[in-house]
Amino acid sequence: ERDMTATKGLEGIVATTSAISSIIDGALTYRGINIDELAEHATFEETIYLLWHGKLPNRAELKSLMDELAANAALPDELLTQLRTYPPGANSMAALRSAVSALALYDEEANDMSPEANLRKAVKLQAKLPTIVAAFARIREGKEPIQPKSGVSIAHNFLYMLTGKDPDEVAVKALDKALVLHADHELNASTFAARVTVATLSDIYSGVTSAIGALKGPLHGGANEAVMIMLDEIGSIENVEKYISDKLERKEKIMGFGHRVYKNGDPRAKHLQKMSRELGERAGNLK
């Protein structure tokens, strides 16, 4: 008789192996380099190169990557027109998911599955994702999108496209570090979803669209959004205790605490806490 035992959620199941990132004894590494070292000494662009090519770039390789990203950051006019048709109250992740899916329509190499073409498409996606997010953020506020500029980092460009002003270096450094810390995380739900999609020999745009759809969920990346909603609901520091007590009494989850993988603390948290304090000091608000 066949064994019909099922493991819910694939817990403990080895779906594949990876040389890209790993979590061993609570330590996160990208290509064998500890996240602490990368957070303190590497830029997001250097981290992208590391994840894609297995090594940190030299000066020429980094410049080449940054030039390619800058050359591909602008969006097709047709996609900007499409973004303007989205409801202002639409979920930003849903808008991003739809826009990434639409990008495939404007890429003549969309169905070229060669490694060389996929790398070119990865550059296009990496370059355009921040532009999409910034453009939709401005459109929903009734403002015109701002074209990306060349010669600056992804973090700098994103903040510039959001505000129309060159950002404070502290803010750029903070965002850059946050991007490094979140660049990869083993075979999480969104990565798994992307791999399942491309395993059918579907294109990279379909894979990334699947990944964004999974990331949107409140049990994955959507937890970040849930934390922000919770903070808005709390309003001020005086309301924290009652808010949390009421949540616990109703047996509801307190978002932003605990992690399925890290049982003794997330190694990325200390960098985010330090960064938050620096930004708070800059803004004159440490609450």
Predicted regions and their residues:
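Hydrophobic alpha-helical bundle cores within soluble ligand-binding/oligomerization subdomains
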Residues: 2-287
